[in-house]
């Protein structure tokens, strides 16, 4: 028997089987129902298992409510607070190409340009939406410049939304409130940035940032713990190219200083910078006060003063 005939007969058998499962039970002709829990197709009349070990084509995860289902679903882009419309609106591509990558004609390009314009108008229909769009754009820009992770951007966006809902913006600039939200979110996430670093990437003055930050924290009741000098150490050590040993030694110095009350009333950035400089000397790694000053964005005088205070708390630091 040729291969062609064998394939033909196998195809006929397959078609017959599919026809039987579609038409009904092969024994009694009753209705066949699918038992998804057990992966079986069963006759509702006689109980014959027509098919078993069926393939579950549903998701591999489980959800117990609609909110959890939406969070786990991978259909469509996830919602995010970093966009003024939470990512729910439609975006029209600016590349002027069709689905196959071909360039659009002149008439089609003009049509798409008009559609984009109207789409953008509908996305920001009122002043509140325009305010939110501008602020979230500022938050994203500053977070990128500061190298902050996505969770900080999300938290900063939520804080700004709360400030907008509670009507805290009158009398204050959008940039000022947005900057204070980034500063607060970074501290809450344990990846703080100094006021000087924040001011370097912001469009408002340092004094306004500090003033607005205190106002937002007070009015919204945000829980922001005092900045820990140890949280600055990994970033400073990484930027200076120091080893893990030096980073660990710097944290030990700060813990000793904290136990002896050196932290009180001192800038956490200055203490962290001095500890990193001292740790580099202890581990025989080359660095200078000027390099540490540049990385930490703090004066060499402050580093020297904090260094000598750490020297009093830790007798092993070389002078």
UniProtKB/Swiss-Prot annotation:
Biased composition regions of type Basic and acidic residues, renumbered to the chain: 1-16, 59-74
Signal peptide (residue range): none
Positions of TFIIB-type zinc fingers: 21-51
UniProt binding sites for Zn(2+): 25, 28, 43, 46
GO cellular component: transcription preinitiation complex
Record's function text: Stabilizes TBP binding to an archaeal box-A promoter. Also responsible for recruiting RNA polymerase II to the pre-initiation complex (DNA-TBP-TFIIB).
Sequence repeat segments: 137-220, 231-312
InterPro entries cross-referenced by the UniProt entry: Cyclin-like_dom, Cyclin-like_sf, TFIIB, TFIIB_arc, TFIIB_CS, TFIIB_cyclin, Znf_TFIIB
SMART domains according to UniProt: CYCLIN (SM00385)
Record flagged with keyword Transcription: yes
Official protein name in the record: Transcription initiation factor IIB 6
Residue ranges, annotated region (Disordered): 1-33, 59-89
GO biological process: DNA-templated transcription initiation; transcription preinitiation complex assembly
HAMAP family from the UniProt entry: TF2B_arch
The organism's place on the tree of life at top rank: Archaea
GO molecular function: DNA-binding transcription factor activity; TBP-class protein binding; zinc ion binding
Keywords: Metal-binding, Repeat, Transcription, Transcription regulation, Zinc, Zinc-finger
Family membership noted in the UniProt record: Belongs to the TFIIB family.
